[in-house]
Amino acid sequence: MVAIPLRIMTADAHPVFREGLAAILSAQSDMALVAEATDGNQALSLFRKHRPDVMLLDIYLSGMSGLDVIAKIKNDFPNARFLVLTTHTGDAHVQRALKAGASGYLLKNTVRRYLLESIRAVHHGQRRIPSEVASNLVEYITAEALTAREIQVLGQVANGNANKIIADRLSISEDTVKAHMKNILSKLAANDRTHAVTIAIRRGILELDAVAS
């Protein structure tokens, strides 16, 4: 009796990367690529159409983020399996992905063998987080998280706004802005405002698209 291959779907903005995944998957007798999406909205609609066993996707997709795609699909299909494939190693990125419902979080430079093993593992209900990603989680697991307001303040700082402008935009006093910044520097172990922004972007606490807006 011939085993039914795992039905795989991919979602990534970069054609070359999608083509590479397609080539890897096509060489596996136990896997079949059923759909490829280029953005978040397409990923959502194609998943609902094809119902793949495992979906491989990046965090950053146009139209709708990969994390929003996961959360929306999980809401309708609780047993759906997701494996994130990205270049982002920040602990906050990983935490958000796992919270959204991803079963694995791999970097795009992962070796082919580990990728294929991870797809099969995720399909069987296991989690897959490589050591280099797990080490980032462990490093900051005891760190005090920034509050939503502190992230707002830091986002304003990242856009180059002075305390007075931040205070006006967030409808708070300048003293409150300063207090938030003091807490931010302490929590991130940052030397100054610029250092805090750099750390927050690297860890995924601040999203690049939010900073640019």
Over which residues does each language-model region extend?
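Short, flexible helix-to-coil linker/hinge segments that flank and couple to helix-turn-helix
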Residues: 92-99, 103-152, 205-208
